[in-house]
Amino acid sequence: MDQHFQVRIRSVFSYAVRLVDMYTRGAPFRSSLSVRLANHPQVPVCKGDGWYIFSDLPDGIYTLTISSREYIDRSVSFSVITGRTSYTESVIYLHPSPAYPFRTGDSLIRGRIFVEDGSPTGGAYVQAVISYERDAPVRLAEDADKEATELIIASKKGQVDLADAFLLETPTCKGTIIRFASPPKGRVYPLTEPLSFAYPRGTVLLPLLETYCDDRGEFVVALPLFLEKTHARMKIEVRREEAAGFAELSIQAGTTQSIGTIQLNRPK
């Protein structure tokens, strides 16, 4: 008589990462997306909505590499420890590359970065700060004390996205880059780090946009959608090791603007 056996194979969860398109805040384009471990053959299971799951990894430290034609390459390290009671999950925001399929009418700033000898520089960090001529959409609704761990925000654009970064700055207070740690309770937003300085009620939260250059030294900054009817200027700062470059321009919503080239210079 034939005997039949049912075998169940159980996988042990190791690591999960959610990839998010920094521009759309949704799942990234997958046409050229590669999500792999450096020096390890396992391929993750894609669960949809940008989630990638690794299972049954031996204990150790791993490097996850993310590459795509549409996004700037990323890498992140994580560890696997057998018996860990808490799950290891991460959210990684992917910044659009110059090859990203933006739509007609999107507000874009494009440029190229060169070093002093005229050659392009890849991987340079690009930081763009938006300042308003009027009608700033996000402000402090109450005074913020030094060492404050949360802010009370007044926003004309609805709830502020946790992926957003801002610069707090006044003529008498040094600038501080802030990020929010978790969803707000009403208008109260917890900070990832306490404030280093105090800021008065009404201080504008200046949107801070970040990206990197590709291997050819090219970059693109996509403006937030809520800027469509706002008069604003943008200050761009580019850094690579000790070298830095700067540019400034008026924003024209609904257009693609080129600032040409920015040269990186080392301090003398």
Give the residues covered by each predicted segment.
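Short proline/glycine- and polar residue-rich coil/turn motifs
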Residues: 46, 80-86, 143, 182-184, ...
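Exposed aromatic-hydrophobic patches
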Residues: 51-56, 152-154, 191-192, 218-225, ...
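Short, acidic Ser/Thr/Gly-rich low-complexity loop/linker segments typical of extracellular
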Residues: 26-56, 134-136, 208-220
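Autoprocessing Asn-cyclization modules and mimics
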Residues: 98-198
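A short, solvent-exposed beta-strand micro-motif common in secreted/extracellular proteins
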Residues: 58-70, 217, 228-242
